[in-house]
């Protein structure tokens, strides 16, 4: 047993990969050879507006983008990817989709399906989906927030802090082991 917990046979890592992406009009993207060949801008003027305002992040999703997101969700569910959350991100034309947590090996495969589905469905909406981590200089890039956890086969979340110092021992031990592993490897 692990620090007084019930016997467990194995631990199960789970992941929820939040995929960020940019959407641009296909007709405009086709006017840029750098976007066509590199999937990002390589030259050009700085963005006309900084990111100091949160009007995009907290703004309403535009109708065209909302239709795209709706179709992406339908296609992902057909593939068995339980996508549920989508929203604007910080930079103009930047968005995010977040599938539901699942076992790590399945989540990685599903993220590949998510990226392919985003690109395919974007084309049907006259959009170009850009997954490059830094497609535009001077604005936020597109990352992949990798939320993860470790759960025993008994359903105990090993990364959940306890309410008392005694209940917190397991969490602190697991956290110390993770930190040591990251430092060593």
Regions found by a protein language model. Give the residues of each.
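Acidic, glycine-rich low-complexity/disordered segments
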Residues: 31-32, 38, 73-84
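Short, conserved secondary-structure transition motifs
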Residues: 13-28, 98-100, 137-142
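Flexible, glycine/charged-enriched surface loops at secondary-structure junctions
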Residues: 10-15, 83-87, 128-132, 185
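Conserved beta-strand and immediately adjacent loop positions that scaffold enzyme active sites
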Residues: 6, 20, 147
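Short, small-residue-biased leader/transition segments that mark boundaries at the very start
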Residues: 2-9
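Short glycine-enriched loops at secondary-structure junctions
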Residues: 27, 82, 86-91
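Loop-rich catalytic cores of soluble enzymes, especially ATP-dependent carboxylate-amine ligases
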Residues: 35-70, 90-91, 95-108, 112-116, ...
């Amino acid at each position: 047993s692990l620090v007084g917990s019930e016997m467990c046979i194995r631990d199960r890592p789970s992941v929820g990969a939040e995929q960020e992406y940019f959407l641009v009009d296909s007709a405009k993207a086709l006017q840029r050879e750098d976007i066509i060949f590199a999937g990002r801008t390589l030259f050009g003027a700085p963005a006309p507006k900084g990111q100091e305002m949160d009007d995009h992040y907290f703004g309403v999703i535009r109708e065209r983008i909302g239709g795209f997101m709706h179709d992406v969700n339908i296609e992902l569910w057909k593939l068995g990817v339980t996508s549920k959350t989508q929203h604007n991100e910080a930079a103009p034309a930047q968005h995010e989709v977040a599938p539901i947590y699942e076992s790590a090996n399945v989540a990685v495969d599903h993220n590949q399906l998510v990226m392919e589905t985003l690109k395919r469905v974007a084309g049907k909406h006259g959009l170009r989906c850009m997954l490059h981590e830094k497609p535009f200089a001077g604005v936020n890039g597109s990352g992949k927030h990798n939320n993860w956890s470790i759960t025993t086969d008994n359903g105990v979340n090993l990364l959940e802090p306890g309410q008392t110092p005694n209940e917190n021992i397991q969490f602190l031990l697991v956290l110390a082991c993770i930190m040591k592993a990251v430092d060593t490897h």
